[in-house]
Regions:
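Membrane-anchoring hydrophobic helices of lipid-metabolizing enzymes
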Residues: 1-78, 91-92
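Soluble catalytic domains of membrane acyltransferases
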Residues: 61-196
């Protein structure tokens, strides 16, 4: 029991130590310099996301398996729809698509006061939709986002359930947002499944 508990403590200390300095620097840089905030955000996405899984694997025996062989069969650019199971899903995609520019559709609350995450989402221009936006407003956000990601050769990622599942089962698929993003980006669609 002590060994299991101690490994959790060590993992938390490592994770906290890893994210604290970049998070604080990005909070300071965001209002002052977009260029520096972009550099810090890129570091968080490209360096810290893979390290997160290394720490979890080392101390908690958490393993990530992705079908990397399937990437060679995909077109150069596409959009992704996926189920949404946990708070690690975004980091999973960052790890799997290491080196590619990916952008998420998220609720705007994540763009405010969430350490490490908020400045990255705002600086990299992810699609932050107000929770209480009218349907037409939400569709407008998605249309602009789809066009922007296609022009910048970025991979837009949408969780059409709209939120994380509470029990591991796939939730209701909201197709209107998917259709608008697909139409505005003009990109082929890749369906991903997250499990575990």
């Amino acid at each position: 029991y002590f060994g299991v508990h101690m490994s959790s403590v060590i993992a938390l200390i490592c994770l906290f130590g890893m994210v604290t300095v970049p998070s604080i620097l990005n909070v300071i840089a965001y209002p002052v310099s977009h260029k520096w905030s972009m550099k810090i955000s890129s570091y968080i996405v490209n360096v810290l996301a893979p390290r997160l899984f290394s720490i979890l694997n080392c101390y908690k025996k958490f393993h990530f398996w992705g079908y990397y062989d399937s990437l060679k069969d995909l077109p150069e650019n596409y959009m992704i729809i996926s189920n949404h199971q946990s708070i690690l899903d975004i980091a999973l995609f960052m790890n799997f698509y290491h080196g590619r520019e990916i952008r998420f559709v998220a609720k705007d609350a994540l763009g405010r006061h969430v350490p490490l995450i908020s400045e990255v989402l705002r600086t990299q221009e992810h699609c932050l939709i107000p929770r209480h936006a009218k349907p037409m407003e939400a569709m407008d956000y998605l249309a602009k986002f789809g066009k922007r990601t296609a022009e910048r050769n970025q991979i837009p990622i949408l969780f059409p359930e709209g939120t994380r599942t509470k029990d591991g089962n796939v939730g209701k698929f909201y197709s209107a947002g998917f259709r608008r993003l697909s139409e505005s980006s003009g990109l082929p669609v890749v369906v991903c499944a997250l499990d575990g």
